[in-house]
Amino acid sequence: MDYYNNDTPGYVYLEDGTLMKGIGFGAKGIRVGEIVFTTSMNGYPESLTDPSYKGQILVITHPLIGNYGVPEKNYVNGILTNFESERIQAEGLVISELTEPFKWNSKQTLHEWLLSEGIPGVYGIDTRAVVKRVRSRGVMMGIIASGVEVNNPEEYLKKKYDEMNFIQYTSPKAPIIHQGKTGDVVVVVDCGIKHGILYQLYLRGFTVVRVPCNYSADKIMDFYPKGLLFSNGPGNPNLLTDLVKNFREIIEYNLPTLGICLGHQIATMALGGKVKKMKFGHRAINKPVIDTTTGKSYITTHNHGYAILSKQDVPIHTRVWFYNPDDGTVEGWIHEKYNIITTQFHPEARPGPWDVTWVFDKFKKMVVGDA
């Protein structure tokens, strides 16, 4: 619905030379990023603020976006309950139709939100065509432009997503403490954690200490943690050699440890497993996983472009905990020597189903000694 201004030109330029014209909204400008898509029907405030989307241009396949607007931020003990970080992390947004909001708690439109945060958007794009191209050719770099023409796109596209370290922008510069109801401290090695994960830890009474991702094992142990969580985050995990080294050092303390998404990948590489780039990744809120310990199937939220592609790539002394029946990717493992569990998917969802929030209950039992 053209409810604010339909005169702003918008462009999406793909690395393979494809140029698509639409209508710009949000902030005017040009952004460059890896073109990725999500099939989620809702949850655009959470998706856009997910730090894992740093460096990426998000294409949403659902045709109607914006119809419930953008709510006011809500905090519990410094933790956002309706956004995944303090700001939009994606480089830009590509959608089919921008709709006028109609919901009681909407404080601004999607256009106003993107405008206030300096993020360009383009609508009126055949998102199905974009997705078909990405699915057949794989993820690629792209340019999004709102109200500005793109000259010399080849110059912009010299940047390569796989070669850039994005966690320097999403990891905190100093420790952040969220006081819980108990004295049980969980240190989060924060590569760009979603607030949904923080909230699940808070609900279980933990005092959460978020530390920069480059913190050494000695600095982490200064907080006397009873458990560790290695968080999600953006970018190519194979570039994060220092973080892998730190993980190898900290696991010698044998603390109960949970790795989620990027944290799962870091743990995998630290213990000798292999993490590889996927053709177009998993980004959706309806991905199935099978729990090998029970045989049960769960519907889960995914946002990752790298993965353990087969059971042969898991670390030694681990057993596969979850796998995706669609393509066989390993979605979690349990270590047989160290007190470590991991999930590639997001057990906190946000957005998505709450089928596997019990993973945090399992982690709590590990921390308090009942596992």
Curated annotation (Swiss-Prot):
Region CPSase, residue ranges: 1-186
Binding sites annotated in the UniProt record for L-glutamine: S52, G233, G235, L262, Q265, N303, G305, Y306
Record field: transmembrane: none
Residues the record marks as active site: C261 (nucleophile), H346, E348
InterPro entries: Anth_synth/Amidotransfase, CarbamoylP_synth_ssu, CarbamoylP_synth_ssu_N, CarbP_synth_ssu_N_sf, Class_I_gatase-like, CPSase_GATase1, GATASE
SUPFAM superfamilies: Carbamoyl phosphate synthetase, small subunit N-terminal domain, Class I glutamine amidotransferase-like
EC number: 6.3.5.5
Class in the EC hierarchy, top level: ligase
Known pathway: Amino-acid biosynthesis; L-arginine biosynthesis; carbamoyl phosphate from bicarbonate: step 1/1; Pyrimidine metabolism; UMP biosynthesis via de novo pathway; (S)-dihydroorotate from bicarbonate: step 1/3
Gene3D superfamilies the record matches: 3.40.50.880, Carbamoyl-phosphate synthase small subunit, N-terminal domain (3.50.30.20)
Superkingdom as given in the UniProt entry: Archaea
Molecular function via GO: ATP binding; carbamoyl-phosphate synthase (glutamine-hydrolyzing) activity; glutaminase activity
Catalytic activity annotation: hydrogencarbonate + L-glutamine + 2 ATP + H2O = carbamoyl phosphate + L-glutamate + 2 ADP + phosphate + 2 H(+)
Coiled coil: none
SMART domains associated with the record: CPSase_sm_chain
CDD domains given in the database record: GATase1_CPSase
Keywords: Amino-acid biosynthesis, Arginine biosynthesis, ATP-binding, Glutamine amidotransferase, Ligase, Nucleotide-binding, Pyrimidine biosynthesis
UniProt GO BP: 'de novo' pyrimidine nucleobase biosynthetic process; 'de novo' UMP biosynthetic process; glutamine metabolic process; L-arginine biosynthetic process
Stretches assigned to the Glutamine amidotransferase type-1 domain: 185-371
Role of this protein: Small subunit of the glutamine-dependent carbamoyl phosphate synthetase (CPSase). CPSase catalyzes the formation of carbamoyl phosphate from the ammonia moiety of glutamine, carbonate, and phosphate donated by ATP, constituting the first step of 2 biosynthetic pathways, one leading to arginine and/or urea and the other to pyrimidine nucleotides. The small subunit (glutamine amidotransferase) binds and cleaves glutamine to supply the large subunit with the substrate ammonia.
Oligomer status and interactors: Composed of two chains; the small (or glutamine) chain promotes the hydrolysis of glutamine to ammonia, which is used by the large (or ammonia) chain to synthesize carbamoyl phosphate. Tetramer of heterodimers (alpha,beta)4.
Family the UniProt entry places it in: Belongs to the CarA family.
Protein name: Carbamoyl phosphate synthase small chain
Organism: Sulfolobus acidocaldarius (strain ATCC 33909 / DSM 639 / JCM 8929 / NBRC 15157 / NCIMB 11770)
Record lineage: Archaea, Thermoproteota, Thermoprotei, Sulfolobales, Sulfolobaceae
Gene transcribed to yield this protein: carA
